Amino acid sequence: MAMAERPRPGWASYHNPNTNSCQDLGNSILLLLGLIICINIGINMVTLLWRRLRGFLHQVFRVICEKEASKLRSPGKQTQPSKHSSPAVHLRCTMDAVKMTVTPPPTRRRHRRGSSSRRARRPVAWAPDTDDDDDEKPPHQHTAACSHNWDYPEDWEGLQTAQRFWTPWAQDTLEPPTQTIRFQQTIEGRPLKREMQSDLGLEAYVYPVNPPLPSPQILSHKNSGGGAGAGAQAEQEQCAPAEPPILGPANVPDIPRRRSSGRVTYDARDVRRRLRELTREVEALSHCYPLASGSSTAEGTRKDWVYRSMTER
């Protein structure tokens, strides 16, 4: 047999560079694919865990910022004001032309109402009521709601003070509130200023809308300065109660004490009717007791005349 041919070293040297270059190219491609896969996985992980990672970073930075702020405040410490203060008064009132209801602050914490209840409406002027009869048709009711909302304190420690404030409203009393009208001296020619007070601490100043002018006969008697008979006649004419003009309504809340612990209601028409009667009596008394000038001022006219209305009517 012929001798087997031995591989030549030239052929081996010719084929080795090609095989090495192919292997290097394949390895580089695999490395590139692996790198792309790793980047994709990393992006997916960051996307899934971004919320938790953001919360963790926020907590870490907040702790660091609080520590730095405490270090800055530590050299100059200032006394902090006491947190325990009087609670804010919470009132809700609804007004219309006939009735008014005042509600005390609630004892329990309620949820915040919608934005519609927070809108403050402008109050509409009340329509004048010149009718004396209660049987007639009432005027149009113009409602106006007023509300003021703010947060309640967590520790409602001052609730007792608010309850003490509302305690007189809920007491059961049978005696009606006494009304007092006081005359105050003013310059001649100007209407008298009347002050009406009640046991509830309400005050109202009433001015006559159209005060009756003195008759020319009385002025002539005063200027002429006649005898005693003429003076007596003028005084009688002056003391005669003249019919006062129809006065407009006055908003004087006369709140009766009723057996109600939550709400207190009053009738505005009844208050206006009573006020008209009182103003008529005041006009009559003002004619009977005029304000005299400096030299002729009597000792009795210097004092304030006190008139108490009859509650038996």
Swiss-Prot record:
Start-end of Polar residues biased regions: 76-85
Transmembrane segments: 29-49
One cellular component term from this protein's GO annotations in UniProt: membrane
Bias-annotated ranges (Basic and acidic residues): 300-313
Region (Disordered), start-end ranges: 71-90, 97-151, 243-263, 291-313
Keywords: Coiled coil, Cytoplasm, Developmental protein, Differentiation, Membrane, Spermatogenesis, Transmembrane, Transmembrane helix
Coiled-coil intervals: 263-289
Domain of life (superkingdom): Eukaryota
InterPro entries: SPEM1_N
GO biological process: flagellated sperm motility; sperm individualization
Topology term for the membrane: Single-pass membrane protein
Biased composition, class Basic residues, residue ranges: 107-122
Function, as annotated: Required for proper cytoplasm removal during spermatogenesis.
Protein name in UniProt: Spermatid maturation protein 1
